[in-house]
Amino acid sequence: MKPKSKILIIAGSDSSGGAGIQADIKTVTALGGYAMTAVTAITAQNTTGVKSVVPIPPKEIEKQILFTSKDIKPDAIKIGMLHSPVVINSVIKSLQKIKTKKIILDPVMVAKGGFKLINDTAIKVLKEKLIKKVYLITPNIPEAEVLTKIKIQNFETVYTSSPSFLKLMKDLGANFEIQK
């Protein structure tokens, strides 16, 4: 029997269970993996929107990542909501210590109801420091627009802007990209 892949999920907690760490745990488990977590923020939200976001102190995020990884070495890391520059830098510092190669970034920026989950300074740090450390980035269309400053209006725009988007992602340091 093949051992389960061990996935460390670094993301915000969604109280409704439809996104964030809760959704990632469900996905990893459904695919036969073993999910470990480091919570970056606690949200009060439901299917209609986000009421509040309470950040976890960066040192606590580092402790979660390092202590979990010391016991169970992750085969891959999936990163979701990182809401501030301090948190992004804290996660980068932790990643350098655990040296897992397969890092997937879902650059969560805006909740479905339009609630902004990351500030402009954090977006800059994400682009300048974190993207170059990931194996795969998986932005949705609004996130891709923020990262590239390319407006995607319809399927044709997605198709025609893909080469520019891929070049921009490569320039930022990403190895692979899946647009969702």
Task: Kindly label every feature range from the protein language model.
Residues 12, 106, 140:
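Active-site glycine-centered loops adjacent to acidic/histidine catalytic or metal-binding residues
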Residues 7-29:
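Glycine/serine-rich anion-binding loops at beta->alpha junctions
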Residues 78-81, 111-118, 147-153:
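Flexible, glycine/proline-enriched loop segments at strand-loop-helix junctions
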